[in-house]
Structure formats: C-alpha cells, structure tokens
Amino acid sequence: MTKVVILGGGFAGCAAAHMIRKKHKDWDIILLELTDKLGAGNRTQFYGGHPHTFGPRHFLTPWNYTYEYLDELLPLRKLDHSFYTYVERDSNFYSFPMSYEDIDTMPDKDIIYEELKQGTNIKDPSNLEDYWLKKAGKTLYEKFAKYYNQKMWLVDSNKELDAGYDDWSTKGELIYEKKGQNFHDMISAYPKDPLGYDKYFDIATRDIKILYKKKVSRVDFEKKNVYCSDNSNYDYDVLINTISVDILDQMCFGELRYVGVDFIPIVLPIKQCLPGNTFFLYYSGKEVHKRIVEYKKFTLHESEHTLIGLEIPSMNGKHYTMPILSEISLYKKYIDNQGDDVFNIGRAGSYEYIDIDDCIDQAMKVASKI
C-alpha cells in the first residue's frame, strides 16, 4: 500500500489530503500537524465573541475552477470591495492600486505628472525601489511604496527586494485610469458559514489519519522517513510538504528568512467602522502598522460593536516569504537536496507569496501527478 505523509494542516495540506484521497481510496495517508487544530491562520478564532481569522483571509482568485472546488464543499458569498491606502503626508485616503483619478486630487499632482512624463535614467530595474522610481517617479514611490515595503518586509532599503517586485508590489497595473479598477477580472468571496473555513478542513480530512502536536525535526530523504521531536517517525512513499523546507534538513544550508505579524484585536463601541465596501485599509507611511481589517464585513457577525484587527510586521512567525533572490536560491538548494517523491506546496512549502486559491491549485497539480 502506498504511504503518503503530509506535513502541515493548513489550506495546502488539507486540500492535498482531500484530493489525493478522492483519487486513491486505499492509500495510507497521514497528516502531521504542529498544533492541536487544522487551518492555521485561516481557522476562525474569537475575541469578545467576534469571529475572525489571522488577517483578512478572503478568497481571491482569477481561476474559476478553484472557486467552484471550494464553493461546492463550502458555499461562498461573493464580495465587492474597495481597496484604500492612507497617505499621511496628504492627510488623505487613496485607492490602491493607484489611479489617475486620485492623482488629479493630490496637492502635488503637477510634480507627479512631470515625474511620470520625464521618467528616470534607470533602464532595467533590478529591485523594487528602481522599479517604482522608473514607473511612477519619486513622489508616488514615497507616498505608496517606499515606507510601506520597508516596514512590510523589515528591510532598511527596498533595493534588497529584488524578486518578483513587478507582480506582488502593485496588485495588477501600476496606475489605473479610474479608482476601483483593480481585481475587476477576479472572484472575491468568503464562506457563508459563521465559522468561516473551519468546516472545509473537517470535510477535506474526513478520511485522513491526523496526528496533532507533531513537530517535525528532520526528514531522511534517502530512507524516506520523517522524524518528529517526540521521537516518533513515519516512513513514506510520497511526501507532501507545506512547512518551511529548511526545517526538513535541519537548516544545514542556513535558515530561510521570513517576516511575521503581530495581530492586535480591538473592539470598538460602534456597529460599523469602515464605510461602504471597504473591508480593510492599508497604511503606507512611517506608522508601525501596515493594515487594519474590519471582520464583520467578511463574517456578517451581528453585534452592536465591531472588531478590527491591527497588523504590525514583526519577526513573530513565518507568515511572509522574502522576495529576495538570494533567499530563493537558498530555497532551491534545499529542494535539490530532497530527492524524489517530495512535493512542496503552500506558502512556506513553495516559498512563494501566494494565497488560498494558489494552494488549491498546487494541490490539484500534485494529485494529478501521483
């Protein structure tokens, strides 16, 4: 009988378990989870009776097949929401990604348009700072990207950010004509269930053996064996990994860099905090926080009060992989050392800044290969 061991019970691990079980009814599938619950940051928590996830875990995708997969198991409610950033130097909120409609209202619009017209002498940008200076100019860079990315990634200079910056830093086009044109071709949704995604994790692992509080200490790729800190070990024919790959090799090549988040829940004595279709706000200046989220907008929780979550980048956890080429090279070095029959998926496993839909897509691809 083929033995499959899955490391990590977040979205990627649960999706892989569900899809592999559907395809192979008789395989022995074990999922090892570090904590005592499945779902990781997508699992519903409570503060003052208010349900919330760790950050705004809305389902956002350009792929209808990932939406249909999840919606069939866990009915989703489609969302229409606006994205805004507070720019302290202007004492104003603007849509993000940026728009010419907003630029026309800025006090320094003449300078901005002149910078956009002149461009820079940077021919081939090789990092986030140069990319923004070339595409948007100094003023817009400082308003929207300079300080936000320095605090988001905990770096002294955005020149350190030299991988994929033209994709993740702009969330689409750099500047749109009108406000709110971003994500017009994507599906945004959230579960109708009051417990959010929790039922999905139960459904996905219904026929899977789950072992909780299992801290992986290393993997012997030659013997195909996973060793845990409690001295237990599990042999495998196929290994699905969703945790940081440096852990599997005892960080023999060095530790991969991540950024974490300090999450601060705050209940306010009002029914609604943010207006209209605004679910969360970004803060792009020198303030320590990067985002606030109003969770009732997602959960539709009924209360005379409302819960917001304040997010401050920190070294607390491994929530964001680093968009730095040297870190990606280190990741690939670990992958090359793993041998056959190992599949790395999820944000930590693939060392990519990805979301729920990507995890589902990766799980689908793995299931199709084995």
PLM feature spans:
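Active-site/ligand-binding neighborhood in enzyme catalytic cores
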Residues: N92, D104, D108-N225, S232-D235
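Mid-domain catalytic core of redox enzymes
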Residues: K23, S217, F221-K224, C228-K333
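Glycine-rich FAD pyrophosphate-binding loop
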Residues: R21-F46
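Dinucleotide-binding Rossmann-like beta1-alpha1 core, especially the glycine-rich loop
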Residues: G48-I122
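Conserved Rossmann-like nucleotide-cofactor binding loop
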Residues: A12, K37, D246
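A short, Lys/Arg-enriched amphipathic alpha-helix followed by its capping loop at the start of a domain
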Residues: A15-W27, A204-D207
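Beta1/beta-strand and adjacent pyrophosphate-binding region of the FAD-binding site
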Residues: M1-A12
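C-terminal catalytic lobe of FAD-dependent flavoproteins
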Residues: T321-I370
